[in-house]
Each structure stands twice: as C-alpha cells, then as structure tokens.
Amino acid sequence: MKKLLILFLLFSFYSQAQEKENAIAAKKNEFRFDVLSLITSSKISLSYERFVGKDFSVGLNTNFSSSNKLNKDFDNGYRNNVPKFEFNPYARLALSKSKSRYYFAELFGSYNGGDFKEIIRLVDNNNVAYYTTLKSKYTDFALGGSLGYKMYFNQKIALEFIVGFGKNLTNREKSPDVISRVGLNLGYRF
C-alpha cells in the first residue's frame, strides 16, 4: 500500500509540473526590459521575443543610450566613439528541456550607430597647418553570439541573464570593434 501511495504522489507532482510547462509553452510572446544596462550605463534596452517552435524563438532588441559619463569622456577626448543606438534581431535555441528554467544560445545581428571624433590636420589659406577635432556620426553592422539563462515565475514573469559579443564588420575605422550584449532582463510572457 505504501508503494502505491508513493507512486501516486510522484505521478501527481509530475502531472503538476507538466501543467506548468504546458501553460508557459502556450504563451508565445514576451516583452523584456534590461535593468542592468539602465543602472550601469543609462541605456534603455527593450526586447520582444516570439516563440515559434518547441525550442526555437526569434526576437528584436533595441538599445538607446544617453550616458552622461560616456558623453563627457567623449567630449574630453578619452574615447573616440560613443554608441547611441542598436537594433539587434536575434534567433535563440533552448539548450534545456524545461520550459520554466533553461539555458539558451543566441545568434544576433546588430545595426548600430553613434558619434565619432577624430583629430585631423588642416591647412588654412596662408598655408599654415593646424589640428582640429572633427565630430561625425557612424553606423555599422555586427554579427555575434550570446549565451544566457532564463527562468519564469508564476508562468508569466521572466528573469533572464545574457552575455554575448559581436564584431562590427563594415565601418571599422569609426565604430567600436566589439559590440557587447550583457543584461539582466525582466519580462512578461503572454
């Protein structure tokens, strides 16, 4: 009788876990907000993800930055570029079987841009050479990859940690060499 009772309890716990997994899998859309980027670099980062298969999803992440510290460093000559925006379409593959807590791998593209500054040598009408600072804008495209971990609370609230890097490909003399995707995201799945 004890064995039958233990077997019944194990089966009921398993069926409850399956119900939670199915409830999460039935929700196909998710919005997220990056808390870490806002705190550390005054960057607003929003993401939308659409779950299109059992272990596969696609999405878009947008970042807008207006960090006073980065702008001050840029104006004082400590850096020659400052990123202002990013649009990152991505595709993700879940690496774990669970739908409520899982690791994932991501491939992303990044259309990014910002301000660029360089010191150039000019010659005036009297053939006198002088140096000046020239500010301009840059845009670039990067490809990269990320790894992350996501968990759900109450089948709707998402907590995600992601770390990834990409390399700018087209305008490398003005844009940063590396694009990073590091974040601690809070989201809502519906």
Residue ranges of model-derived segments:
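Extracytoplasmic electrostatic interaction patches
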Residues: 162-173, 178
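Transmembrane beta-barrel outer-membrane domains
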Residues: 24-26, 37-41, 78-84, 134-142, ...
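Gram-negative (and chloroplast) outer-membrane scaffold detector with strong preference
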Residues: 50-146, 151-157, 161
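Short glycine/proline- and aromatic-enriched beta-strand/turn motifs that initiate or cap beta-hairpins
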Residues: 18-66, 71, 82, 92, ...
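Cleavable N-terminal export/targeting peptides
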Residues: 1-25
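Membrane-embedded beta-strand positions in outer-membrane beta-barrel channels/transporters
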Residues: 32, 45, 88-90, 142-146, ...
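Gly/Ser/Thr-rich helix-start
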Residues: 149, 165-167, 188
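Outer-membrane beta-barrel "beta-signal"
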Residues: 178-190
